[in-house]
Amino acid sequence: MTMKMMVHIYFVSLLLLLFHSYAIDIENEITEFFNKMRDTLPAKDSKWLNPACMFGGTMNDIAALGEPFSAKCPPIEDSLLSHRYKDYVVKWERLEKNRRRQVSNKRVKHGDLWIANYTSKFSNRRYLCTVTTKNGDCVQGIVRSHIRKPPSCIPKTYELGTHDKYGIDLYCGILYAKHYNNITWYKDNKEINIDDIKYSQTGKELIIHNPELEDSGRYDCYVHYDDVRIKNDIVVSRCKILTVIPSQDHRFKLILDPKINVTIGEPANITCTAVSTSLLIDDVLIEWENPSGWLIGFDFDVYSVLTSRGGITEATLYFENVTEEYIGNTYKCRGHNYYFEKTLTTTVVLE
């Protein structure tokens, strides 16, 4: 073996050793992070944890009344931990004040907690899940849920010519349960034929190809679930109101007073306004920048608030309490959309 080859092998071995050591350090830091999380749990939760198991976090999932609900055990869903657990079984238990009860098989589907008809009584319940691998390692997590009212029909506007080659995508907003059987789509109460020409379907998305004005209308998606206790499918629906509009003029006018007249010790504000040529679209975003060029958000002392309606977008810059340090400062208003960008400035002056 030549000296050059020996040196090459040495450096490769050293790199592998360093990488292995680094990976171990990362895993140890992840474990320490979750151990600290365990220490912050309230006593009513921590008392049920098995000290021989690692803690894998908590989850507070969204649920809708009268609809199916499902939740994964937190360590299985957490990107920091999921790679550790491949072949495993999951045990679910309901935590009560002075005891814990095993969740029946009818409330477990594919290892996930499954509630076919979520009612308000479930919103106060806590569930402990224990993941056990084939080699005996275990990790635990705690799941809660909170109620969110499903939205009514969600409006969506599509402008012809924006991305016609990709089509219009409509998302069926079922967020509360996994493991559905299928989704059927309707337009104006008539079932859509998924022919992969005009309409195609990918997961929860309906794609409308070759968009045209006539594609406007009401779109309903019906999600079908099954449950061993219920003879017929469980069906949940969502709807979208799609409005297809002709190609628009995206130019806009930016309006801003060049001076902010202020008084020391008092609040002040100034509004930057973008008026779109077309009142059918609100596609202008307005941002304020401080004298250093940093974007101003919703912070203390100086902050901005954005509103948009009917082709008019406004961003108001607020000063909670004007001090001498603000006098003479110049702030930049930047309005932009996909097509155009404009900027104006204003300077703080004493009245």
Curated annotation (Swiss-Prot):
Kindly list the GO molecular function terms attached to this UniProt entry. Answer: receptor decoy activity
Q: Where in the cell is it found?
A: Secreted
The protein's matches in CDD domains, at most eight in alphabetical order, are given as: Ig (cd00096)
Keywords assigned by UniProt, alphabetized: Disulfide bond, Early protein, Glycoprotein, Host-virus interaction, Immunoglobulin domain, Inhibition of host innate immune response by virus, Inhibition of host interferon signaling pathway by virus, Interferon antiviral system evasion, Repeat, Secreted, Signal, Viral immunoevasion
PROSITE patterns on file: IG_LIKE (PS50835)
**Is the Disulfide bond keyword given for this protein?**
yes
Main location (coarse class) = secreted
Summarize induction of expression.
Expressed in the early phase of the viral replicative cycle.
Intrachain disulfide bonds? 73-129, 172-221, 272-333
Q: Which GO terms describe its biological process?
A: symbiont-mediated suppression of host innate immune response; symbiont-mediated suppression of host type I interferon-mediated signaling pathway
Q: Which Pfam families match?
A: ig, Ig_2
State the InterPro entries in the record: Ig-like_dom (IPR007110), Ig-like_dom_sf (IPR036179), Ig-like_fold (IPR013783), Ig_sub (IPR003599), IL-1_rcpt_fam (IPR015621), Immunoglobulin_dom (IPR013151)
Q: Which family does it belong to?
A: Belongs to the interleukin-1 receptor family.
PANTHER family, per the entry: INTERLEUKIN-1 RECEPTOR FAMILY MEMBER, X-LINKED INTERLEUKIN-1 RECEPTOR ACCESSORY PROTEIN-LIKE 2
The UniProt subunit note reads as follows: Interacts with host IFNA1.
Role noted for this protein? Counteracts the antiviral effects of host IFN-alpha/beta and key IFN-inducible proteins involved in viral RNA degradation suxh as host OAS1. Acts as a soluble IFN-alpha receptor and thus inhibits the interaction between host IFN-alpha and its receptor.
Q: What is this protein called?
A: Soluble interferon alpha/beta receptor OPG204
| Gene source species | Vaccinia virus (strain Western Reserve)
- Gene name per UniProt: OPG204
